[in-house]
Amino acid sequence: MKWMIASDIHGSAFYCEKMLKAFEREQADKLLLLGDILYHGPRNDLPKGYAPKKVIELLNNIKEKILCVRGNCDAEVDQMVLEFPIMADYAMITEAVSYTHLRAHETGAYL
């Protein structure tokens, strides 16, 4: 099983779309989101392409492929619109992990 790991979308449809294109291109089976999905936080500027409603739509379209851990900018109200669980502070994954010496820039495995 191939996992893609991402975090800190902060409501940016621009970066969410880039992430989902990489998810498709890399043919990953699951997407592990490490929080901060919709809100940008009170101390941060609005990210490029800030459109949380669009992010909701994009992520709900692949909800069965997402495992999410709550970030510091995620709130209970976010769970009302996202169709996959986000409120757990932790999750247990029982998958084998392999390590490689290839760097992301050598394989093109980056956004």
Where are these regions (language model features)?
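Conserved small/polar residues in nucleotide/adenosyl-binding loops
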Residues: 100-107
